[in-house]
Amino acid sequence: MTRNGIGIRTAQVRSERLTGQIHVYDGVGKGKSQAALGVVLRSIGLGINAPNNSNRVLLLRFLKGPERDYDEDGAIAALQRGFPHLIDQVRTGRAEFFGPEEITTFDRSEAGRGWDVAKGAIASGLYSVVVLDEINPVLDLGLLSVDEVVGTLKSKPQELEIIATGRGAPQKLLDIADLHSEMKPLHHPKATELLMTGIEIYTGAGKGKSTSALGKALQAIGRGINHPGSTRVLIMQWLKGGSGYTEDAAISALRQSYPEVVDHQRCGRDAIVWRNSRQELDYVEAERGWEIAKVAIASGLYKTIILDELNPTVDLELLPVEPIVQALLRKPRDTEIIITGRCQNQPAYFDLASIHSEVYCHKHYANQGVELKRGVDF
């Protein structure tokens, strides 16, 4: 029997894997640091009540000096306020873009300082996840020795997860990576013509779509920390009526720490939906989810709305496209919409996206038979 369509699988795990993986998110598209923050949130979600801070995370940010504000600053502030005992942050570098011809002694010194912190953290055994944010361009610029970094990562403690982000990942790093997702930007001239802003789409077969969306949710929460009532987030999920999905721990962590800010709804059967095995309940559940989303978009109550797995829902023809287009065209200007999920045929609302990243899967450890790990994969 031929099966056409897209199914959303729950995470399957036979036992807790003992070997931590090396993740690389690169490419020129948006979503790399956001995806890393999503993984951080998953790990923290499982570590809230864990003994001995066993899910502690280090977020080490290269090329991001303290003199400038970055997109993810609000997200990190939300993490540190909600889970101060589970996350450490170190920032290095100067707060401006520079090319190879503009490298200074300070740049090399700051890269070395950051790498010294990284080596100590990796060897310490204190962390379950170490994020090396923007280490890829640091290596590409020659500020650190690729061979030294690769050698250290290859000899890391067995259970430690490493996440490396940024453009220009060197081939030697990609060779040892267990997961490699590349963010490729796609541009939609119609969105520019219509002056559309605040619609982001993450699609493709690579890992990092829903996690990027969760990073955006964290950013929204962080922006509203000092302005109670100014920020509210809705996470609306389709095709996810069961449990054990990759982002469950992350959403649970958000709702536990920010219950008055985060709303979460999901719809669908606890089953994989194929095009040739759709049931009446699939249509009913998809429409139920859209009614919730449509009202939320029009209300102006939410500043960030995540429409998780809307793309495959439309691709499976469980929802019509035109009502979605019209709702997005009429959204409040200060409402951000993040839409996720792979699809075979791009629906018309893609033309309204001001940011669209195709997450391309070069390598994924799950395809090599590696068991999934709670707090990283789900």
UniProtKB/Swiss-Prot annotation:
Identify a single GO molecular function assigned to this protein.
corrinoid adenosyltransferase activity
Domain of life from the UniProt record: Bacteria
Tell me which Gene Ontology terms the entry assigns under biological process.
Answer: cobalamin biosynthetic process
The protein depicted here goes by the name Uncharacterized protein all2391
